């Protein structure tokens, strides 16, 4: 039995692939790309929310938002550790993101214009992320699957607090309700785009599904998100900004309109509203933090020298 056959056998038997196991080079590269993008998304995702920490309406909201952004930093670091088990260096993949050679989730290139956006990001954006990530708890690569189990627990808390913030606005004044509807109007379609291109137009999906890196296609996950979320929008007394949305009695699913794929292409190729701003902020943070990294290395070297002595 060749190594390749043994690998395929383990995938077929749903046995997790671990870092020390043999794996095809393309499998390793696909995982580095996916886990790296996922980690970058957590780190860049701190920016739109961090924008509102100093302007949160109450101390309670501020404390929740601080904790949420802190969680996202932790998720990013956790995922970089998972990527490093595949033999890449986190500095290398982080630098690729700063240089625009690696992507992060398209959703974070939209601005957060009002407090309602923060609730809607927690509810819709983290809601879409959970649909994606719950499926990844059974991904074929062990360290990634285990990271997902931990992250999903925290993400579900993020989503609940986002929905609760939206609920407070929905029960508020006319202008608060209007602010919430406006945020839903702006984030609904970008949230649907988070699942990636349609399956017949997704360059990496078929191979990722065959290797069980992904367990479901983009379209199936997007449908699941719409089915979960439309009743929540209605419960808040809000409207989904889609004239074509209707419930299909026969299939039990909601049918929804066509996504603006030109906008999606623009955003993932660096032409979104905030692409330039997000990367500039991360580059500045990387440069401003250089002294911390240098100090940590010098400290580690001193500790090592003491132990040797």
Q: What kind of region is each of these model predictions?
A:
Residues 1-6, 63, 68-96, 162-167:
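Conserved alpha-helical segments that form or flank metal/cofactor-binding pockets of metalloenzymes
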Residues 1-18, 40, 92-102:
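Acidic, low-complexity proline/glycine-rich segments
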Residues 16-36, 96-122, 139, 172-176, ...:
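Acidic/His metal-coordination segments adjacent to aromatic residues that form catalytic metal sites
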Residues 178-309:
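Extended, helix-rich structural scaffolds rather than catalytic motifs
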Residues 22-27, 45-67, 129-144:
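Helix-loop segments that flank and shape redox-cofactor active sites
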Residues 139-190:
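Glycine- and acidic-residue-rich phosphate-binding/metal-coordinating active-site segment common to enzymes
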Residues 110-161:
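Internal, conserved structured core segments that host functional sites
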Residues 27-38, 56-75, 118, 143-155, ...:
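Alpha-helical scaffold segments that form or flank carboxylate-/histidine-based iron centers
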């Amino acid at each position: 039995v060749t190594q390749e056959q043994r690998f395929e056998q383990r995938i077929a038997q749903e046995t997790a692939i671990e870092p020390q196991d043999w794996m095809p080079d393309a499998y390793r590269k696909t995982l580095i790309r996916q886990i790296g993008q996922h980690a970058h998304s957590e780190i860049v995702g701190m920016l739109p929310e961090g924008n509102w920490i100093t302007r949160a309406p109450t101390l309670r909201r501020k404390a929740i938002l601080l904790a949420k952004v802190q969680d996202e930093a932790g998720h990013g670091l956790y995922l970089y550790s998972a990527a490093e088990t595949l033999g890449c260096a986190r500095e290398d993949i982080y630098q690729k993101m700063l240089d625009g050679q690696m992507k992060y989730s398209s959703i974070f290139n939209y601005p957060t214009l009002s407090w309602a956006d923060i609730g809607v990001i927690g509810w819709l954006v983290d809601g879409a992320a959970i649909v994606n990530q719950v499926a990844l708890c059974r991904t074929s690569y062990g360290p990634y699957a285990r990271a997902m189990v931990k992250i999903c627990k925290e993400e579900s808390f993020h989503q609940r607090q986002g929905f609760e913030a939206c609920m407070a606005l929905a029960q508020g004044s006319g202008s608060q309700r209007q602010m919430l509807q406006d945020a839903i109007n702006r984030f609904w379609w970008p949230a649907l785009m988070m699942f990636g291109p349609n399956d017949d137009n997704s360059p990496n999906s078929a191979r990722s599904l065959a290797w069980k890196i992904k367990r479901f296609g983009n379209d199936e996950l997007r449908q699941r998100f719409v089915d979960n979320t439309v009743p929540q929008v209605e419960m808040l007394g809000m409207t989904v900004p889609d004239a074509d949305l209707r419930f299909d009695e026969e299939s039990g699913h909601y049918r929804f309109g066509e996504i603006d794929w030109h906008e999606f292409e623009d955003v993932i190729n660096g032409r979104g509203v905030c692409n330039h701003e997000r990367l500039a902020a991360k580059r500045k943070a990387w440069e401003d933090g250089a002294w911390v990294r240098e100090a940590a290395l010098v400290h580690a070297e001193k500790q090592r020298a003491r132990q040797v002595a």
